[in-house]
């Protein structure tokens, strides 16, 4: 009923009836004078009533407000412009602006009804709606048109002068600059981009003045103080400008003023002097000036492509310094694998420390270190390994390689074998040193060479039972697996340990079976090792030797025992890998000699004639050993380095085993003895096996050739694997993928890749694309 009456009387209440009551309250609010609660609420209801009853009430209110606001702003303008001095003007403006801007949030509230009637918006008290209020917009637009647009350049220039003064060390009220910034940010009427006026004016002026300042200051400072002091200056100024920017520039999320300012500063302070600063890098790296390098790194990391020259300098230094140190120590490290590995680790730790302290282990610098260190590890300057390859009876040489993998394997052997080195270390220390070897191994390109030598040493340790710690031996296999060694290689090593354990059980059964039987040799004195040919991969070459009767008679007994337990398997005897202990008795004393089967066969030639002299020719007939093996074996008995009195004597004297003739005479040294601390020992034990290889010269040649042949097969397999998957591929992409597949075994040489590609084309596995000879197509 009440609503219908109001509507019936619509038009009877006019704007003019209420404005006289509203007007004084509006003026009080503009002047920041206090109003009563009743006046505040009356203003809300009067605005609502006028908008509801007077058809043109909303427009009239809007116009009246505009006039009042304009009048108020004119008064403020007069107060501001009464100051001629720019700084005084700025201060006056900030005072007036702060008061006015506060009222921009208060005055629009009672006039929310205007939003509904003029714009058709639903009434809301949300802050976001208040910011879009037409009254607020009216206030800000009027301020902008009446005051700000007329004096903004003076205000802006004054603000920039204050910032300039601050850069020179003068103090001032920072709120003056902040106030100007706030004006720019809040006076934009563009709803699509509310920061447009700020960006086009204040931000641009701030960036331009900053750049001008440092374009003048920076070159002067550099010239007077030098590069190293300038870097400190630039770093300090960048930090200083960032703090200043956070104070004076807009920091809301959608605004990137601070980032733009920092880019401007970097251009003026760093990019402009990039070449001059980087010229110092190489010298700093050489002098290990980590603090200065860290400073340079932090500066150059802000510059596009600023880091690349530093990475190049680091790589060049690691390679040149690393190789220089290796060459300087060449005399020692080429003959001592322990010293060699220690030298490599010293270099790695030195360069790693440099990267950590100077570049905070930044991944880019770690990659540069790895690349350069790999070059040092795989360099063939100091010592090289040449792997021969025979094709159709012709001996060919492959490209020389670093001997590093061989020396790493030798060092592992020193740690894993019973040696003076391993005896003075605890298990934990041995483990730590092996882990260090694995670290270096990661950088070795041709890991297949390491595998070959490591396996040869392991074979020797397992056969001679000279491992320092069996648990560490088996752990080493798993560590090799963890560092990415090929699974087939690691599995073979694991199988070798399995064979040794199985052999222990077989020995126990053999001894149990024959404990009451009379054999040529007591069962307790025999240790048989049954080894899987696939895992141990011995050469096909068999070396014949005439064994002593006791051993010859034992062999059938072992074969019969084995066949009872494992039918269908065939045993091949490898005397080359066998060894034993014999007792040497003379008037001086009694000594146990650890010998190879070949040494044993030679010494047994004197068993029935201990004082006779036997010629080289007759020893060859007695032992039936090949010439090369007999010479090598005899030399180990006449010139064993650890003995002062040798087991055998010979005449005439020669410089090497190659100089033995058919007529060279050999005899047992009846005065043989072991001497310790210059005293003759009546009893003792000596290992005469020493570093004698458990392979022949020809076997070693075959193994070296085998490495190359296996590389050829692996390369062919990898190419086919890639071609099957890709079907069609460019030569460059093929080489990249090929290296990725083979990198855990070896780095294929370009020559080898080319040869295998030609072989596969010839045998119609792949073909060249007719349209592009550098593209290959798989032929199913």
Curated annotation (Swiss-Prot):
Pathway: Protein modification; protein ubiquitination. The modification Phosphoserine is found at residue 34. The modification Phosphothreonine is found at residue 210. Keywords: Isopeptide bond, Nucleus, Phosphoprotein, Ubl conjugation, Ubl conjugation pathway. Neddylated; which enhances the ubiquitination activity of ECS complexes and prevents binding of the inhibitor CAND1. Deneddylated via its interaction with the COP9 signalosome (CSN). Residues 711-772 form the Cullin neddylation domain. Core component of multiple cullin-5-RING E3 ubiquitin-protein ligase complexes (ECS complexes, also named CRL5 complexes), which mediate the ubiquitination and subsequent proteasomal degradation of target proteins. Acts a scaffold protein that contributes to catalysis through positioning of the substrate and the ubiquitin-conjugating enzyme. The functional specificity of the E3 ubiquitin-protein ligase complex depends on the variable SOCS box-containing substrate recognition component. GO terms for cellular component: Cul5-RING ubiquitin ligase complex; cytosol; nucleus; site of DNA damage. Component of multiple cullin-5-RING E3 ubiquitin-protein ligase complexes (ECS complexes, also named CRL5 complexes) formed of CUL5, Elongin BC (ELOB and ELOC), RNF7/RBX2 and a variable SOCS box domain-containing protein as substrate-specific recognition component. CUL5-containing ECS complexes specifically contain RNF7/RBX2, and not RBX1, as catalytic subunit. Component of the ECS(ASB2) complex with the substrate recognition component ASB2. Component of the ECS(ASB6) complex with the substrate recognition component ASB6. There is a cross-link at residue 724 (Glycyl lysine isopeptide (Lys-Gly) (interchain with G-Cter in NEDD8)). GO terms for molecular function: ubiquitin ligase complex scaffold activity; ubiquitin protein ligase binding. Belongs to the cullin family. Its main location: nucleus. The keyword Ubl conjugation applies. SUPFAM superfamilies: Cullin homology domain (SSF75632), Cullin repeat-like (SSF74788), Winged helix' DNA-binding domain (SSF46785). It is found in: Nucleus. The lineage of its organism: Eukaryota, Metazoa, Chordata, Craniata, Vertebrata. It comes from the Eukaryota. One of its GO terms (biological process) is regulation of neuron migration. The gene is Cul5. The keyword Ubl conjugation applies. This is Cullin-5.
């Amino acid at each position: 009923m009440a609503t219908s009456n109001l509507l019936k009387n619509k038009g009877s209440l006019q704007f003019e009836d209420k404005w006289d009551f509203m007007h004084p309250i509006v003026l009080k609010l503009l002047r920041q004078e206090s109003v009563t609660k009743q006046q505040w609420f009356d203003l809300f209801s009067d605005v609502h009533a006028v908008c509801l009853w007077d058809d043109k009430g909303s427009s009239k209110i809007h116009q009246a407000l505009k006039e009042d606001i304009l009048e108020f702003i004119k008064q403020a303008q007069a107060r501001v412009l009464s100051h001629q001095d720019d700084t005084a003007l700025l201060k006056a403006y900030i005072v007036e602006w702060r008061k006015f801007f506060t009222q921009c949030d208060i005055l629009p509230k009672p006039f929310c009804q205007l939003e509904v009637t003029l714009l058709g918006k639903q009434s809301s008290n949300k802050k976001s709606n208040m910011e879009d209020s037409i009254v607020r917009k009216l206030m800000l637009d009027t301020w902008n048109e009446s005051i700000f647009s007329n004096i903004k350049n003076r205000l802006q220039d004054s603000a920039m002068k204050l910032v300039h003064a601050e850069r020179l060390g003068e103090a001032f009220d920072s709120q003056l600059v902040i106030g100007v910034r706030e004006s720019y940010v809040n006076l934009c009427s563009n709803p699509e981009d509310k920061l447009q006026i700020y960006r086009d004016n204040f931000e641009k002026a701030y960036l331009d003045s900053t750049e001008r300042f440092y374009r003048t200051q920076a070159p002067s400072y550099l010239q007077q103080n030098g590069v190293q002091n300038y870097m400190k200056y630039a770093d300090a100024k960048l930090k200083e400008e960032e703090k200043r920017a956070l104070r004076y520039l807009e920091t809301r999320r959608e605004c990137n003023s601070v980032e733009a300012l920092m880019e401007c500063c970097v251009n003026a302070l760093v990019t402009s002097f990039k070449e001059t600063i980087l010229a110092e890098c190489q010298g700093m790296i050489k002098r290990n000036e980590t603090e200065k390098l860290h400073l340079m790194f932090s500066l150059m990391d802000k510059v596009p492509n600023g880091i690349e020259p530093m990475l190049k300098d680091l790589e060049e230094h690691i390679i040149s310094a690393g190789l220089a140190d290796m060459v300087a120590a060449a005399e020692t490290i080429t003959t001592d694998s322990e010293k060699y590995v220690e030298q490599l680790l010293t270099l790695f730790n030195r360069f790693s420390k440099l990267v950590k302290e100077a570049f905070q282990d930044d991944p880019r610098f770690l990659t540069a270190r790895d690349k350069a260190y790999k070059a040092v590890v795989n360099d063939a300057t100091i010592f090289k390994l040449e792997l021969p390859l025979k094709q159709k009876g012709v001996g060919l040489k492959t490209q020389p390689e670093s001997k590093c993998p061989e020396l790493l394997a030798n060092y592992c052997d020193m740690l894993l074998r019973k040696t003076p080195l391993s005896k003075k270390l605890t298990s934990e220390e041995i483990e730590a040193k092996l882990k260090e070897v694995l670290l270096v191994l990661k950088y070795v390109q041709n890991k297949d060479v390491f595998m070959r030598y490591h396996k040869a040493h392991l074979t020797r340790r397992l056969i001679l039972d000279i491992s320092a710690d069996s648990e560490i031996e088996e752990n080493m296999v798993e560590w090799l697996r963890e560092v990415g060694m090929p699974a087939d290689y690691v599995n073979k090593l694991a199988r070798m340990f399995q064979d040794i354990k199985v052999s222990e059980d077989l020995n126990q059964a053999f001894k149990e079976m024959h404990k009451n039987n009379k054999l040529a040799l007591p069962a307790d004195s025999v240790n048989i090792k049954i080894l899987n040919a696939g895992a141990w991969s011995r050469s096909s070459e068999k070396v014949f030797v005439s064994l002593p009767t006791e051993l010859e008679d034992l062999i059938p007994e072992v074969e019969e025992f084995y066949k009872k337990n494992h039918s269908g398997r065939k045993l091949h005897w490898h005397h080359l890998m066998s060894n034993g202990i014999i007792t040497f008795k003379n008037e001086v004393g009694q000594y146990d000699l650890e010998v190879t089967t070949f040494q044993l066969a030679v010494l047994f030639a004197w068993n029935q004639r201990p004082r006779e002299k036997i010629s080289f020719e007759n020893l060859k007939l007695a032992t039936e050993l090949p010439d090369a093996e007999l010479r090598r074996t005899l030399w180990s008995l006449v010139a064993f380095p650890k003995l002062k009195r040798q087991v055998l004597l010979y005449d005439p004297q020669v410089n090497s085993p190659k100089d033995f003739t058919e007529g060279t005479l050999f005899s047992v040294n009846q005065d043989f003895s072991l001497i310790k601390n210059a005293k003759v020992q009546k009893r003792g034990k000596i290992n005469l096996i020493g570093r004698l290889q458990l392979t022949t010269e020809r076997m070693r040649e075959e193994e070296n050739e085998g490495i190359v042949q296996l590389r050829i097969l692996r390369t062919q397999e990898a190419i086919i694997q890639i071609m099957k998957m890709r079907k069609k591929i460019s030569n460059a992409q093929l080489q990249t993928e090929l290296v990725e597949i083979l990198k855990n075994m070896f780095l294929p040489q370009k020559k080898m890749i080319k040869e295998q590609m030609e072989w596969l084309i010839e045998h119609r596995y792949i073909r060249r694309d007719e349209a592009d000879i550098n593209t290959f197509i798989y032929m199913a």
